[in-house]
Amino acid sequence: VEDKHLGGICLNWGCIPTKAMLRSAEVFLLMKRAGEFGLTAEKINYDLSSVISRSRKVAKQLSQGVDYLMKKNKVRTFMGEAVLTAPDIVEVRTARDKELIKARNIILATGARARELPGLEADGDLVWTYRHALQPKRMPKKLLVIGSGAIGIEFASFYNTLGAETTVVEVVSRILPLEDAEVSDFARKQFVKQGMDILEKALVEKLDRKKGLVTAHIKQNG
């Protein structure tokens, strides 16, 4: 049972589309370094809408691939919502009707959504969630990324490479805190070398929004 797109968050709104965006940024960076490879390239630029369109296309193709595999392996698929009405009964609600399914084993794979942080609520214009960052209407001149987990760092790298003045704020003592310390240290050095600002042991306390701009109040320890 799936309410939107087969493949869930990772395939449609997470690691797959971000990797497609990062690939575009990587090629853009390589083109800017063409001279290092004995090549000549002039007026190198990017079209943000085309970059995003490619990313969404990649996600869509893979989602359709999952749909194909479901049909090939004769897995019955419902596009709708599921509600547990008993320990062994699921009520499936689709656009057309409702159906009860009884099963001994039920797997809850609910996916994820962006958590609303008090005082930092997203509006899709000045303050984004990951979904807004995957479908930007314009390229920001400055970008503050709160959190340096995998997806936060991916967005920071993408927008920094394409020219946004990017700052990353991480509440603990190092970026990519779930990775090995050596990996975090190496990544930090590379990102700083690329012009990214990184604030560790830092907390965004509140945002002031006025006249199309956001001012972040950041408290940093150490």
Walk through the language-model features, giving the residues of each.
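Short loop/turn elements that form and flank the Walker-type P-loop nucleotide-binding site
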Residues: 139-140, 162
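Phosphate/pyrophosphate-binding betaalpha-module
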Residues: 203
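Glycine-rich flavin
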Residues: 2-139, 167, 172-176, 180-183, ...
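N-terminal Rossmann-fold NAD(P) dinucleotide-binding loop
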Residues: 152-153
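Glycine-rich Rossmann-fold phosphate-binding loop(s) that bind the pyrophosphate
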Residues: 3-4, 146-149
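Gly/Ala-rich phosphate-binding loop of Rossmann-like dinucleotide-binding domains
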Residues: 156, 160-161
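Hydrophobic Val/Ile/Leu positions in short beta-strands of Rossmann-like dinucleotide-binding domains
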Residues: 144-145, 168
